[in-house]
From Swiss-Prot:
Domain of life: Eukaryota
Organism: Emericella nidulans (strain FGSC A4 / ATCC 38163 / CBS 112.46 / NRRL 194 / M139)
Function text: Involved in concentration and sorting of cargo proteins of the multivesicular body (MVB) for incorporation into intralumenal vesicles.
Bias (Polar residues): 840-849, 981-991
Entries under PROSITE patterns matching the protein: BRO1
Membership in a protein family: Belongs to the BRO1 family.
GO biological process, one term: protein transport to vacuole involved in ubiquitin-dependent protein catabolic process via the multivesicular body sorting pathway
Region (Disordered): 760-857, 891-1000
Keyword tags: Coiled coil, Cytoplasm, Endosome, Protein transport, Transport
Protein name (Swiss-Prot/TrEMBL): Vacuolar protein-sorting protein bro1
Amino acid sequence: MVQSPMISCPLKQTNEIDWIQPLKDYIRQSYGEDPERYSQECATLNRLRQDMRGAGKDSATGRDLLYRYYGQLELLDLRFPVDENHIKISFTWYDAFTHKPTSQYSLAFEKASIIFNISAVLSCHAANQNRADDIGLKTAYHNFQASAGMFTYINENFLHAPSTDLNRETVKTLINITLAQGQEVFLEKQIMDHKKAGFLAKLASQASYLYAQAIEGTQEHAKGIFDKSWVTLLQVKSAHMGSVASYYQALADGESGSHGVAVARLQLAEKHSTSALSWAKSLPSSISPNTNLTSEAGPSLVDIVKFHLANVQSQLATFVKDNDFIYHQPVPSEAGLSAVSKLPAAKAIPVSELYQGQDIQRIIGPDIFQKLVPMSVTETASLYDEEKAKLIRAETEKVETADGEMAASLDYFKLPGSLNILKGGMDQEVMVDEEFQRWCQELAGHDSFAKAFDTLQDRKSEVLATLDQCAKQLDLEESVCEKMRSKYGADWSQQPSSRLNMTLRNDIRTYRDTVHEASASDAQLSATLRQYESDFDEMRSAGETDEADVLFQRAMIKAGSKQGKTKNGVTSPYSATEGSLLDDVYDDGVPSVAEQIARVESILKKLNLVKRERTQVLKDLKEKVRNDDISNVLILNKKSITGQESQLFEAELEKFHPHQMRIVQANHKQTALMKELTKTYGDLLQDKRVRAEQSKYESITRQRNSVMARYKKIYDSFNNLGSGIKQAQTFYAEMTETVDSLKKNVDTFINNRRSEGAQLLGQIEREKAAGTSDHEEREREKLRQLMERLSTEPKPPSVPPGSSTAGPAKAKSPPPPVKAPAYPTNIAPPKASPHFAPTVPQQHGTPVSHSPAPYSQYVPPGAGVSYLPSQSFQQGAAAPLSEGYNPMAYPIPASSMSPPPSQPFYSPTPTPFYTSPTPPVPSGQYMPQGYVPPPPPPRPQQPTYPPSTGPFPSGPGGYAQSRPYGSSQHHKAHSQSSPQTGPSVSANSSDPWAGLNAWK
């Protein structure tokens, strides 16, 4: 397959500079050291820049050279100020697109240019990959995202671009191009993996959007910067990706049944593809080398677009034809189509993740100027950071411990909630609960469950009635078969029904057991309804009349609350004459309850102030520690602090001592206040009126909890009942569908057995007629031989074996082939049964039974039972019938039936005609002609069956698992009319096949 051409960014070029002398000058001036000691380090940095200039644009090695130089610049920036006022080096870089030179003394400009080249190398490496190979495809996908990440880093960290290629809008356009190409590469992989059409459409839509964004950038913000071939290529890619998105979305719409919308999307895809083809043809054959595109880019794009356009047009013709002749759905206009959803699969990889999983230190190398600015300084700073972290952890633990002690003490005293009770706030405890109101509102307007239960009972009765009807039909058919076997003996070679209808009977029994199991669940639901029906009615009425508070108050009264009239006429646990504890006045000099409560509240306020102050102090301490930086101190004292780091750390940590002391003082103050609170509140609780009030509150609380628990149980029962009824409705709906499908299979089985029996009966009668003439011939031969023995005349000479003279003992020629019975032409022909070729060869001149071809596809191999040593029978085998045969002429006797007699032998079923012998097929469970496998009954647990090795998966009972179709009026009418056979049956009930005599 032709590979789509990709755009790669050109690299910036730079002039050679000298790092050595400026660095040596700065070392001499600022550090006071001999610069010659660092000659090797300066030369190493200078060589890194020279190597970076010659880095290959499409290899991982070039990327690593650029990144190594960039990493050393980052380390250098921590030690040497490279700018116009300190280390003055002119960095000259040429614009990647306009080739104009730009010179600056800023190290940031040097680093931005290096990152730009890293991005360009990544994009080149990605564009040159062979994406037909899985490794190449993954490499291209990763590198396009990494390139976008490096360009993003430029836009976020270098705000003032000195050149056009580093301009924010230019870089943003490059980001969109690389991300769009990464999205396209990911789409190619998903198309090769044959993912779902809807998923592919979203990926293509995102790619088209990114290419459109890139086009907008080239035309509005970066106009004239990029080569025209780039703009044309972006136009092709945008239109092509839009066509791909519409194409796959059309396929998805077609799969979902929206054929008219699919046609409209294919028309849109054709439009986009035609536009893309026009743009692709406009690509020039000779392209500038600076674009990194080859001369094959144009022809490759033309081939890709043409191939896709052919697919679109082919699918469009198919969809239009299907919609015109089958679906007849309206085709919306292009404006009426919804946009295809976008799914981003390519994201910019951050710089920090460029070498994820690799040893970055190995790529960057050791710090070149480690001797000048030792890394030990950094290590010492890390040790100091750990000391600060220890301090913060210790102070945080003190604050959390104090807060926990306060919370535990207040919770033990039930403060401040208990003060509200003592001040008369207990009336709130008898107000209706919001949750209770919500329960009543949810029950409001809900219909009674009785109607739903009646419907369930009706559905269950219908299911059981259908199952009973199926069982009766099978019993009737089996009885008829065995009566014919009793009448004709060994000549009646039709297989016993008991083995053929085993699957159907098992299904009937299984479904009936399932319904009986469901009846137990129905009984549980009914018991729940009887238990809580009155409560449901109360809550429903309260919700509809907005009197939930009345119901709640009544429930509280029943639970044992004290009584006193309220405005609603309902009793309340408080009486208006009781008054409040705050109204009590003591004359013996003891503080009143109100005064004691005020003292407790005052202490609580002080405790809250202490807690807030302590929390704020800890917050300030953390902020100060986070902003503390002693790097300069460590650098200035790097020679004097060797071995004395701990003393330096202690001196530096002293700046946090005031905050530590404030936390300690707050903890001491809290301890004193808690002691005072314990004494004051204890005295308050010892007051007789307070103790009585508290006892009353506890009683009301228990009553309230009891009421809420009761109605919570009622509410849960209501929800569970509703959920259970929905599950039951779903169960019986599925069960009805399953049983209707079973009924169709039973009808099909009965019809096939009737046809087979009628054909066998005709065969037996023809053989009897032929057998009568043969018997007369044998009697004449016996009489002639007897006369010869009694005769006194000499016997004539014997005839040699090879003589052509015909003797009396001439062997009989084989009987002529049995012809299909002829039926009167004056009878209106019913629907003809399907005609099938025999599948079992005829052996030893004996006609055998053949199964219709469609049966075998439902029979699992290896599951059959052989009835005769010399041949195998398929269960449910029916002899093929003539085209004009009416299978419904097989009557069903209306009289009661006796149990089928057991037969010790089985004979092959005669067949009226024979085609070509085929190998015998192992028999399996009988599957009637036209058998529609019913779905398994909706039970809580399904039995596990061994996997089928046949052409179709098998489910319970060996059925092929397919979706059963529901019942229809035709089948219902057929099942009701089938037992009515006509007067001939009632006239001769002893012979169930008597009705067939009228056909001759």
